[in-house]
Design a protein with these regions (language model features):
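Short aromatic-glycine-enriched beta-strand elements
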Residues: 92, 104-110
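Short, Lys/Arg- and Gly-enriched loop/turn segments at beta-strand edges
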Residues: 79-91
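Short beta-strand-centered aromatic/proline hotspots
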Residues: 89-99
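Short, conserved beta-turn/loop elements at beta-strand boundaries and strand-helix junctions
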Residues: 99-105, 116, 211
Length: 251
């Protein structure tokens, strides 16, 4: 039966209800034995539904233009399987591998993960994994430092202004700087929470390179986002491309 045909609308309605019930039953059944998996499935289904709804109004021109080396945070969905060769899933950092302008609705990325201390070392990684050292940690830490420095500059300017000579124009400028400082501190807090998880080093999973819809990018979406214009150096992307060539026999 072709459920896409108009005459089968009633049957499709019944199948949708059946599927919804099956999903609910399945999630409740695994909740007791594997809450982590149940939660991941729930997030995936919830987010996928949201992405489908967003497709109707999605316009890539409102996203930043991505360049090779840009750091992004991507929802890779629910990973199927376990062990080597299984599909990578969840919300993770990734590095952009190819330019993607405002007309392109997709972007090609390589997902990243943290090195598992005590379980692996850079020398024991699989050939499809690239150890990037503390590159991501350093980039994020440097950016957070820049944000604090800028906030400090705003504060000094206010402190060095003579209250007797302050103008309406000065007050308007200070209010604008205060709002920017609040945004910078919020972004700084987000970055610092991430930095604490990355000091062991970062691994690029070359076998999981994929092209994803920009709808899946959680950060950065706007110029004010924490990861906006944040990029690893050329050496990191060169390492990844070298492994790509070896892994896929690219001349």
């Amino acid at each position: 039966m072709d459920l896409k045909k108009p005459e089968n609308k009633g049957a499709l309605t019944s199948k949708i209800a059946e599927l919804a019930n099956n999903i609910s039953t399945f999630l409740k059944n695994i909740l007791g034995s594997d809450q982590h998996k149940a939660a991941l499935l729930y997030y995936w289904l919830r987010n996928y539904l949201r992405y489908i709804k967003q497709e109707e109004t999605f316009n890539p021109k409102y996203f930043p233009q991505f360049k090779p080396g840009d750091i992004v945070k991507v929802d890779f969905g629910f990973g199927i399987g376990s062990g080597i060769g299984s599909e990578f899933g969840g919300l993770h950092y990734a590095i952009v591998l190819a330019p993607s302008n405002s007309k392109n609705s997709t972007v090609t990325v390589v997902p990243l993960r943290s090195l598992k201390l005590g379980k692996e070392s850079p020398k024991t990684l699989y050939k499809s994994d690239v150890y990037l050292g503390t590159e991501l940690f350093t980039v994020l830490l440097d950016r957070s430092g820049e944000m604090l420095d800028k906030c400090g500059t705003f504060i000094k300017e206010v402190e060095n202004t003579d209250p007797k000579t302050i103008t309406v124009k000065d007050i308007a400028r200070f209010e604008k700087q205060l709002e920017e400082a609040k945004n910078l501190l919020a972004r700084h807090d987000i970055i610092m929470k991430e930095v604490s998880r990355l000091n062991a080093g970062t691994v690029a999973i070359v076998s999981q390179i994929r092209t994803v819809s920009k709808i899946r990018i959680q950060n950065p979406r706007y110029s004010k986002d924490a990861l906006y214009n944040m990029r690893v150096d050329r050496q990191a992307t060169d390492k990844i491309r070298a492994v790509m060539k070896d892994l896929y026999n690219i001349k």
